[in-house]
UniProtKB/Swiss-Prot annotation:
Keyword check for Cytoplasm: yes
Gene coding for it: infC
Provenance organism: Aquifex aeolicus (strain VF5)
PROSITE patterns registered for this protein in UniProt: IF3 (PS00938)
Signal peptide: none
Homology family: Belongs to the IF-3 family.
Protein name (database record): Translation initiation factor IF-3
Principal location listed in the UniProt entry: cytoplasm
Xref: Gene3D superfamilies: Translation initiation factor 3 (IF-3), C-terminal domain, Translation initiation factor 3 (IF-3), N-terminal domain
Amino acid sequence: MSKLKEYRVNRQIRAKECRLIDENGQQIGIVPIEEALKIAEEKGLDLVEIAPQAKPPVCKIMDYGKFKYELKKKEREARKKQREHQIEVKDIRMKVRIDEHDLQVKLKHMREFLEEGDKVKVWLRFRGRENIYPELGKKLAERIINELSDIAEVEVQPKKEGNFMIFVLAPKRKK
């Protein structure tokens, strides 16, 4: 689940010397690792190897537990933001001969989805003899598109596929 980078801490650091940064972010300079460990120990903090690939490696004096907590917190925030921006495609299915009130309920749901920023995929179902009257579906699709034209634009034009007429509405982009 967590993709946190593992840092070497205190005695795990294998370099002979390091570029030391104190807990306030001030650069102390290049010091032997033993001296850096001693300074960190005196302050009651940990010595953490931040950039092991650098020559000499960069080490920082800090509270490692707090550092890990902050990293996890940032990762959670990033995941949360990513989830917020995901656009879902919501499916709405209805028959071609839908009753007026039922259509209004479906339109209300579509409007809610579009206002939340989701796309809506509309499936108009043809049953039996309705298949020979595709104009019924076209008429209903046009009506739905017109009703939602203030907040939605057609992303995929109505197209008959088998027993369904399918089209996709996307929220209008804000200018």
